[in-house]
Amino acid sequence: MDASQAHDECERVLETIGEAIVADRRFFEDILVGVVGRGHVLLEDVPGTGKTLTARNVARALGLSFSRVQFTPDLLPSDVTGTHIYNENDATFEFTEGPIFANIVLADEINRAPPKTQAALLEAMEEGQVTVAGETRELPKPFFVIATQNPVEQEGTFPLPEAQVDRFLVKTSMGYPDEAGEIELLERRASRDAQSPTVERVFEESHVRDLRLAPETIDTDPDLLSYIAAIARQTRTDGRVAVGVSPRGTQRLFEASRAYATLQGREYVTPDDIKRVAQPVLAHRLVLTPDAAVNDVEKSHIVEGVLDSVPVPTIE
């Protein structure tokens, strides 16, 4: 699948999801960057903004299997990965798959889970497999996690470990709709019988696999590779940042830039592509100093400052 075909397919998905969910197009694009870029997406929003509905309809539009895991403080790793159950008829233990065995997994309120359970999800996200009772089992392909978390200021939530956060290609937020959007939401509800809207399937599973290979055909000028590296390195020199973007984060910025270029139907990356994805790809990877955290420094402002300070190469 070339970039032009990928663009047309992504537009169909964006239009289909937009028919069911009232949100900014950039939000949907961020999620598709995660899908096309072969990464995972972290959504941070207060309850009731439509995170679960979004994940479910993305899976439906892409023609993929979907499961939801509600993370709670007492959730065990086996509740996510599955467990062996004794079969009395055969006198053997049979493995019963957990909800992690789906193409798209919604990890709801991930920052309420104990570290041991988070570690099980971490292995699945990074390796595409889970280990149960010493036995490794492959997960379906494609495999994509959409995790949600409530803002850490809310009661009963805990910040995700740095290693966990770094595994997400993109972190984004729906936010509250504006007044016109909220009225549109009510008008849509008034025009249907079902409480929740649904979308039609746009893709087949094999189609999604082809789409995720499309960014590998996108060209990136050597000057832009230097630009990406310079952006990442600049985050490590800011006095408000204790831990800047890791080399893995640098690579993810490159991959997300190619994925966004694919969404735009271009066969090459531009500086604007890099700037467009820098916020959702980089901001959540920064660890602030204690002083910066106490003073409520916004990570997004740091990324904006980095983008303003790094010279943009001229690409012909």
Q: For the regions a protein language model found, what residue spans apply to each?
A:
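Walker B catalytic acidic pair
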Residues: 45, 108-109, 120
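Conserved C-terminal "switch" segment of AAA+ ATPases
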Residues: 3-7, 20, 157, 174-245, ...
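P-loop (Walker A) phosphate-binding loop of NTP-binding proteins
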Residues: 46, 80, 148
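Canonical AAA+ ATPase core
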Residues: 87-90, 127-202, 210-216, 258-263
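Pre-Walker A (pre-P-loop) alpha-helix and adjacent loop at the N terminus of AAA/AAA+ ATPase modules
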Residues: 3-41, 46
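Conserved alpha-helical scaffold flanking the Walker A/P-loop in AAA+ ATPase domains
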Residues: 31-32, 86-106, 135
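Walker A/P-loop
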Residues: 35-73, 77, 86
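C-terminal engagement/docking regions of AAA+ P-loop ATPases
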Residues: 56, 237-316
